[in-house]
Amino acid sequence: MTDLGGFNDHVARVDLTSGDVRYEGIDEEDARKYIGGRGLGVKYVFDNGTDVDPEGPENLLAFMNGPLTGTQAPMSGRIAVCTKSPLTGTVTDSHHGGWSGARLKWSGFDGLLFEGRADEPVYAYVEDGEVELRDASDLWGMGVHDTMDAIEEGHDGQFGKNLSAMAIGPGGENGTKYACIINEDDRASGRGGTGCVMGSKNLKAVVVKSGTKMPKPADPETFTEGYQQAMQLIRESDVTGPNEGGLSLYGTNVLMNLAEEMDGLPTRNGRYTSTHSEAEDDPSEPNIDAEKVSGENVRENILVDEPTCHSCPVACKKETEVTYEHKGEEMNVRGESYEYESAYALGPNSMNDDRDSIAVMINRCNDLGIDTIDTGNMLAMAMEMTEQGKLDDLDDELEWGDTEHMIDLLEEIAHQESDLGELLAKGPRRVAEERDAHDNSLAVKGQTIAAYDPRAMKGMGIGYATSNRGACHLRGYTPSAEILGIPEKVDPTEWEGKGELCALFQDLHAISDSFDICKFNAFAEGIDEYVAQYNGMT
């Protein structure tokens, strides 16, 4: 049991096999040592056993808040999803924003632990400190968007006001190894195959109704001082400043042009470090231009709204709307997730600079519940394998930048409907092993790299290699210093000092993931503000 501020001391352990729900507190020593969020969630997963089958009923799926979740602390709407990954075979934790983390805290919970496997599809309904399993047979097979609509219609609540849902799509239901969990239509626990684990448990969704259990600081004065200082630094930052900073104006995709200019944008399955270097080396048509899919271009042409997560003044989410023709059919697509990582993987790395096609594919990936980074990178891997004749025996191949085929393949990957879709759904490690395609796989521990070329950013290369959840930019975000100059500018191409830099960011992000607050706080505030808010709350 713990009486630390910021905690409800209330965790639900849900046995999906039997349908039983037990409630337990949090050990005081664990709360102090592991903090919450990622720290506590990974401990639950580790204690559950390291030899479990990731897709077996014995694997644990943990949704965990941190002590700052749902408070006034800036950008404190995050939630950690922790499990053993079917993609990498090791521990993973994946975080998403939006409002579900805060609402879970307000409903009286610090976390939800799912074990076992339901005989039939179910969803978990969470309200006022209790969890109830309900039939989800009518939701099974639906995409995420239709699932969200059905959930909202079936409950006395409204998204954006007092209701949140975290759901899987066909990707999770069918065991795509990089399937993800989608929160409120477009915020993703994207990496590591959390959606695959959720699908293996026949758990379609977790629905959370807001309550009134708002966290109260143990030391209001200390917390308020830390919070106010943090907000001031966020407002003054060139990166996070509301309506002025690059992240606020253009979202994460502000990095597209910056990475391109410094030759740090993996292009053509990482063969090149920018679209202009690809064009210079191979002047034959078609060449592509990263600027066409940049945050600046998106803002100027297809931006329609800028919603935000709980307690966030930055509003990095960029909602877009496009009218796009696919196979003679015109579609209108509106979505909130035109992120840099997604745009890189489905764009330059796949030799695609069709801005609107990327918006369509991001929205479709979210609906199917598959990670945009791994999906785009698997498409790029398939394109290079096609070029090298490694897929000649299949009835389907994929050419560079073939957006029509890319869009169709998303469905085939999630549903595993074609030979190529079934192959790519296995993830890079298994494809490389089955097809002798290790040279085509840009992955560490079976998870593909993000949108920062390690040849141009040595710190990021160390980060990919040492991340415990596979290739990951978020474990230790060295581009903060290597691109943005925060806390100070370093030469991205030099090795000296990069191990120390990477370790610094890995430690910092372990803390923010456990609080659980957004890493973008670190673009403005520092450890002093973190400590003041944590000490004041607990």
Model-derived segments and spans:
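Protein-protein interaction/assembly regions in multi-subunit complexes
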Residues: 2-191, 195, 200-240, 251-271, ...
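Extended C-terminal regions of large enzymes
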Residues: 152-156, 161-192, 198-538
